[in-house]
Amino acid sequence: MSGPGPREPPPEAGAAGGEAAVEGAGGGDAALGEPGLSFTTTDLSLVEMTEVEYTQLQHILCSHMEAAADGELETRLNSALLAAAGPGAGAGGFAAGGQGGAAPVYPVLCPSALAADAPCLGHIDFQELRMMLLSEAGAAEKTSGGGDGARARADGAAKEGAGAAAAAAGPDGAPEARAKPAVRVRLEDRFNSIPAEPPPAPRGPEPPEPGGALNNLVTLIRHPSELMNVPLQQQNKCTALVKNKTAATTTALQFTYPLFTTNACSTSGNSNLSQTQSSSNSCSVLEAAKHQDIGLPRAFSFCYQQEIESTKQTLGSRNKVLPEQVWIKVGEAALCKQALKRNRSRMRQLDTNVERRALGEIQNVGEGATATQGAWQSSESSQANLGEQAQSGPQGGRSQRRERHNRMERDRRRRIRICCDELNLLVPFCNAETDKATTLQWTTAFLKYIQERHGDSLKKEFESVFCGKTGRRLKLTRPDSLVTCPAQGSLQSSPSMEIK
């Protein structure tokens, strides 16, 4: 068979073929409605095929028949057609197919239906071939009007051809059954490996590429999280491969995704040559598995856990050095921050407690100094007890450190609340219902105004009365106290003066 065109009928069937051709040309579709050639769709289960699909299938069948040794397959099919074609059945089908303007359809389309033991295999082969052609040719536009008539005539011709093939299944069913597996397997292999020729007049938006379409289909549908159509042996091999790779290197990326083919070992600080080789081997193994249609199991994951754990350990060691609480220490020149670290020694613990107690002893001379002094003394005693408990307890123990931190935080908040209550009584525009942020804002504005009015004289006087290192009030002699007391009185009476 040299081309996709219809073959000439044998000499003994020539006259009948000519009559059928004349009848088909004159009567349109009348040849398709003969009572002797009518078959139900449940018996044959034929499907519609567009011109593009039929042209592709015809090219594939022609190439397979040319590749067959000594034309054995073609001879068998011709003998089956000669034995089955009645006086006007096969030739009438050829004439009807040629008249409609579409490519002719003849019984070569269903060679597997010639077997007597499996008469329904023609439907299965048609469905498989149609699905493969649809996946390769893409979305082909269907024509209307004359195209529908041509398709109907092609379907009628296919029915006639399939009927003739079914009629020949009786005497010649056994020799033709041997040709079925070879044709079917070779067709599937050709679809999977060798790209078919493009159609002469494609109706799609772009010419089809069967090989690229199949490769893209395999690449896109095979999602790593799903396992589709993979035998159990391949699953076991894939799992064993993953286990071996995991045992070889634990800090590297064991089995990379196709999109992420970079080497994850190069980012780690302690990477060596074996880890790099194992990661590159895993990438190559994955590429081979992709071509062999091996999916990845659902329970597959990336081995990033140990790197994350090492990072957590590094961050944990850094957090031990970070300060737990930052306390403001009143210095001689400026304000400096004292960091209380977790791994502090006993001597540093004592110094910190002394500084915090010193800050708690800051008192102002005035009418409400007694109540404030009691509050500060209670906070000082609680801090002393806290320091003793921290010293007596063991250095280790996460629960003890957490409890100590919670106590210190509660005490800090309590002291902030006491100071804000004091400021609400001293600072203008503040009362007991004012929140802490608003109180601090009014306090800042009030102190700036005092500095504008009085300059640094009050600041220097305050520094001379209180110790900058301990925060305690200096013990002054009688004449000094007589000199400083009016100044302090003017300091406390300044809010009322400013309000006026």
Swiss-Prot record:
Its main location: nucleus. GO terms for biological process: cell differentiation; negative regulation of transcription by RNA polymerase II; regulation of cell differentiation; regulation of cell population proliferation; regulation of DNA-templated transcription; spermatogenesis; transcription by RNA polymerase II. Residues 370-393 have a biased composition (Polar residues). Keywords: Developmental protein, Differentiation, DNA-binding, Nucleus, Spermatogenesis, Transcription, Transcription regulation. Residues 1-34, 191-211, 365-410 are annotated as: Disordered. It comes from the Eukaryota. It is found in: Nucleus. SMART domains: HLH. Residues 481-500 are annotated as: R1 epitope (recognized by Chagas's antibodies). PROSITE patterns: BHLH (PS50888). Residues 347-356 are annotated as: R3 epitope (recognized by Chagas's antibodies). GO terms for molecular function: DNA binding; DNA-binding transcription factor activity; DNA-binding transcription factor activity, RNA polymerase II-specific; DNA-binding transcription repressor activity, RNA polymerase II-specific; protein dimerization activity; RNA polymerase II cis-regulatory region sequence-specific DNA binding; sequence-specific double-stranded DNA binding. Residues 400-450 form the bHLH domain. The keyword Nucleus applies. Isoform 3 is testis specific. Isoform 2 is pancreas specific. GO terms for cellular component: chromatin; male germ cell nucleus; nucleus. InterPro entries: bHLH_dom, HLH_DNA-bd_sf, TCFL5/SOLH1/2. Residues 1-12, 196-210 have a biased composition (Pro residues). Antibodies against TCFL5 are present in sera from patients with Chagas disease (also called American Trypanosomiasis), a disease caused by Trypanosoma cruzi. Two different epitopes that mimic Trypanosoma cruzi antigens have been identified: R1 and R3 epitopes, which are recognized by T- and B-cells, respectively. Efficient DNA binding requires dimerization with another bHLH protein. Putative transcription factor. Isoform 3 may play a role in early spermatogenesis. This is Transcription factor-like 5 protein. It comes from Homo sapiens. The gene is TCFL5.
